[in-house]
A protein has these predicted regions:
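Active-site-proximal alpha-helix that buttresses catalytic centers in soluble enzyme cores
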Residues: 1-262
């Protein structure tokens, strides 16, 4: 019988937010009864993916389920992470060699297409909005030079509108893709929205959510609610936390892992 191990693959950040989120998810998996749960980061934070691979090989792991804790695929996934896992483009299941130790590698997909994400966005919007105002949901994506992130953001915005019944649903991107956050804020105001509930479809806080996004939605760093005046009207803005610590995402990870006989 093979000795199985789990690697939760994270982006990594110079802030501790991403690491805390990853560590929380890993500990929840252990509490659920999963053994040999490891974390590997693509950049900045340790242990790096390659360091975790070596550690798992030393521990005698000969089958790895690598689960990316990402909303969507993108350049990091297609140009960096896959090769750090000793795979080639298009490969998801392969026997790899780590310091002379043969390991069966299974590389799973991000979770952004799962219908659960729209439910999480729906709950965040309903918990945050003021029902006495015309409130609009602004789903904020990172943006990418590849199409994956935009596809996931638009998919979940569409589900929030069509399946959850919310009329005023908008989306925007911090960089690379369009529409920009500023453009979408203007459109929401022009459409008559009185309150903007900004929901970042991100894993964790970090440089973008702390430094880039707040001024684009007329807030200062660390402030979750405020107002601004445009077209002679006062608009309320509420800024939600990212989704990565939601306990239901642990269930999604578990579902992906159980496919491999855990």
């Amino acid at each position: 019988m093979s000795k199985k191990g789990i690697m939760i693959v994270g982006h990594g950040s110079r802030y501790r937010y991403n690491q805390r989120t990853m560590e929380t998810q890993a500990e929840r998996l252990r509490t659920m009864g999963f053994d040999n749960v490891y974390i590997g980061y693509n950049e900045t934070a340790h242990p790096f993916i390659v360091e975790t691979l070596v550690e798992m090989a030393k521990d005698g792991i000969d089958e790895i389920v690598a689960v990316p804790f990402f909303v969507a695929s993108g350049r990091h996934m297609t140009e960096q992470i896959i090769f750090k896992l000793r795979l080639k483009e298009g490969e998801n299941h392969k026997i790899i060699d780590v310091d002379g130790h043969s390991i069966m590698m299974h590389f799973e997909t991000p979770f952004g297409e799962d219908p659960l994400l729209a439910k999480i966005l729906h709950e965040k919007f309903c918990e945050t909005r003021d029902t006495s105002k015309r409130s609009g949901a602004l789903i904020i994506g990172h943006g990418s030079r590849l199409p994956f992130n935009k596809d996931i953001i638009t998919l979940n915005a569409k589900r929030l509108k069509d399946e959850m019944g919310h009329k005023d649903v908008y989306y925007a991107f911090n960089e690379f893709d369009e529409p920009t956050i500023e453009e979408t804020i203007d459109k929401m105001v022009n459409d008559g929205v009185e309150e903007i509930v900004a929901i970042p479809l991100f894993i964790s806080e970090g440089d973008h959510l702390k430094n880039d996004v707040p001024p684009k939605i007329h807030l200062q760093d660390g402030i979750r609610e405020g107002t601004f005046t445009q077209n002679g009207r006062e608009i309320t803005v509420k800024y939600c936390l990212p989704i990565g610590s939601d306990y239901r995402l642990t269930q999604l990870l578990a579902e992906k892992i159980r496919k491999y006989g855990y």
